[in-house]
Amino acid sequence: MDQTLSEFGNVFVFFLLGVVFVAGGYLTARMLRPSRPNPVKTSTYECGEEAVGSAWVKFNIRFYVVALIFIIFDVEVVFLFPWATVFRQLGSFALVEALVFAGILILGLVYAWVKGDLDWVRPTPSVPKMPEMPASKSSSQRD
């Protein structure tokens, strides 16, 4: 029990020293830097150009979908890398497990592909127009 508390105590002291070091750096910088604000310094800097429009721009949802799919497959690599390093010791059961894992992710990719989430430009659905019916004869023309 004492050994565990001692290890957590070391981690806590290390964390506390890190916080003190960062806070000390901020306080030292605040005391030493000159403070001369003016409108040019407080304006928005955008690659040397004047800022145009609002910063609250709506991004296309396709960016998020592509990023999410990338993260999913990036995490897959993170999970498969340790498996690949000890593949020979694990045997055929581990191979089957890895293939099932990769298969599930490939099914997810196929689903996203079929659904159209990977298409950058989606075709707009078109509604067929109803053909115009010829004008019916009025009752006076029938007589």
Swiss-Prot record:
Q: Give the GO cellular component terms, alphabetically.
A: NADH dehydrogenase complex; plasma membrane
Q: What is the lineage of its organism?
A: Bacteria, Pseudomonadati, Chlorobiota, Chlorobiia, Chlorobiales
* Reactions it catalyzes: a quinone + NADH + 5 H(+)(in) = a quinol + NAD(+) + 4 H(+)(out)
- The gene behind this protein is nuoA
Source organism, top-level taxon: Bacteria
**Which terms does the record give in the GO molecular function aspect?**
NADH dehydrogenase (ubiquinone) activity; NADH:ubiquinone reductase (non-electrogenic) activity; quinone binding
* Keywords from the named record: Cell inner membrane, Cell membrane, Membrane, NAD, Quinone, Translocase, Transmembrane, Transmembrane helix, Transport
EC number, as in UniProt: 7.1.1.-
Function field: NDH-1 shuttles electrons from NADH, via FMN and iron-sulfur (Fe-S) centers, to quinones in the respiratory chain. The immediate electron acceptor for the enzyme in this species is believed to be a menaquinone. Couples the redox reaction to proton translocation (for every two electrons transferred, four hydrogen ions are translocated across the cytoplasmic membrane), and thus conserves the redox energy in a proton gradient.
Q: Where in the cell is it found?
A: Cell inner membrane
Annotated transmembrane regions = 8-28, 63-83, 93-113
Q: How does it assemble?
A: NDH-1 is composed of 14 different subunits. Subunits NuoA, H, J, K, L, M, N constitute the membrane sector of the complex.
Q: What is this protein called?
A: NADH-quinone oxidoreductase subunit A
The way it spans or sits in the membrane comes to: Multi-pass membrane protein
Question: Which family would the database say this protein is a member of?
Answer: Belongs to the complex I subunit 3 family.
What the entry lists under HAMAP family is as follows: NDH1_NuoA (MF_01394)
Q: Which InterPro entries does this one have?
A: NAD(P)H_OxRDtase_bac/plastid, NADH_UbQ/plastoQ_OxRdtase_su3, NDAH_ubi_oxred_su3_sf
